[in-house]
Amino acid sequence: MIGTTTIDNGPTTIFSSKLLSRGQKDLFNNALKVESSDFIKTSANRIKPVFLKAAHKNVVITSKNGVEALLNNCAAEDLNFETIYCVGRRTKRLIEQKIGPVKHSEKNAKALAKYLVEFIEGSEVTYFCSDIRMDDLPTILEESNIKVQEIEAYSTKLEAPKLGKSIEGVMFYSPSTIQSFLQKNTPECIAYCIGESTAKEAKKYFKDVRVAKIPTVESVIELVNQNYI
């Protein structure tokens, strides 16, 4: 059931669509009042262990949530993935810590798809994704006659609150966080985006869209600070 909670604690200037740690909040300029909450909540779907234990030549994982969902269904040592590709440095780090080596990573799904079209060995990939995802990767691969076997590894729920009118900017970390925001809010503020895929979605609705130099929360914070020097 959709609630009607409104967050408006006075002169809040910036809102993060992901819960921030105390250390991250301390990185903002002192003049800013910053609030945060998780605009999306994820939960692992059940994937049959027999499927995960079968041989998969080319595996694509586009988020840390996908990694965690896999490990929720099957022990890492039982996964039979020959070659792993992923999106994002933090996703790569988690995969290599928990599962095994990553052959190649890119900063977004579109860039990874273009790489795979050029360099993949074979003509099929197994793509572990959310029930809510962008079309870039499967579309680009299938247009190049690369078969995509999509597995919904986790589900995404949109749970953004209604924000107060004092908000001047919102920090977004995925296209899903933007869709969540739009369920109860109007795009009248600045959209600070973690990367190009998120910015592409934001530009459909927001007049002022800004993109971090590197895809990290800290880089988005730096982007915000630049507007309040």
Q: Predicted regions span which residues?
A:
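Signature of uroporphyrinogen-III synthase
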Residues: M1-I229
